[in-house]
Amino acid sequence: MFTGFSDATIDFLWELRFHNERPWFLEHKQVFLDTLDRPMKALAADVTAALEQAHPDRKWYLHVARIYRDARRLHGNGPYKENLWFTLRCDSSRGPEIPAFYFEITPHNYSYGMGFYWAKANTMACFRRAIDADPLPLTALAERLNAQDTFVLTGQDYARAKGDPGALLRPWYNKRVLDLSCVREHDDLLFSPALTDAL
């Protein structure tokens, strides 16, 4: 059961940023396990259980990121990630090309929401065709999003607009990838079991 992250979690992430090398990590591996790895896995398990209870007709696939970077893709970075996250999606076979719920913690902040990590061009073309065929469901969602202040629409835009369905839907229509994100500074919620319910 998730009981909250701690100041030690944030301290570990900052220290890792400045000491991103194997000897330092091995010396601090127990700190990683106690303050970041186990709490992240507990939070992911609790959120998964809540989703399974709320939507028993769906199969949820949980992925908790590993701290280790892919050695083939270091590109001058250290061997360890300075942020950790988990994702939950309904279809594991299509990987990052379908939307997922996510939570991420970094040395600076934490975020959660739903969206694409990466979407194929034809996936977004299907999304635009769905908007063209029936804009009302997305119009209702866009209006609800604009009426609240927790989540914002983010994601990379296409260099050239793909069309203009009107001012309300234009930001959605012209995204290369999109997500609805809540980004927060490290606050009391992060250090509390109540984070599970917030997610």
Protein language model features and the residues they cover:
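Hydrophobic/aromatic-rich structural module bridging two neighboring secondary-structure elements via a short loop
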Residues: E52-P96
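Long, solvent-exposed, polar/charged low-complexity segments
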Residues: M1-E15, R38-A44, F151-L199
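Active-site acidic/histidine clusters and adjacent loop/turn architecture
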Residues: W14-I67
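Short histidine-centered catalytic/ligand-binding loop motif
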Residues: K29-L36, F116, C126-I131, F191-L195
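Compact, glycine/acidic-enriched structural inserts
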Residues: I105-D164
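Short, flexible loop/turn elements at secondary-structure junctions
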Residues: R69-A71, C90-S92, P107, F116, ...
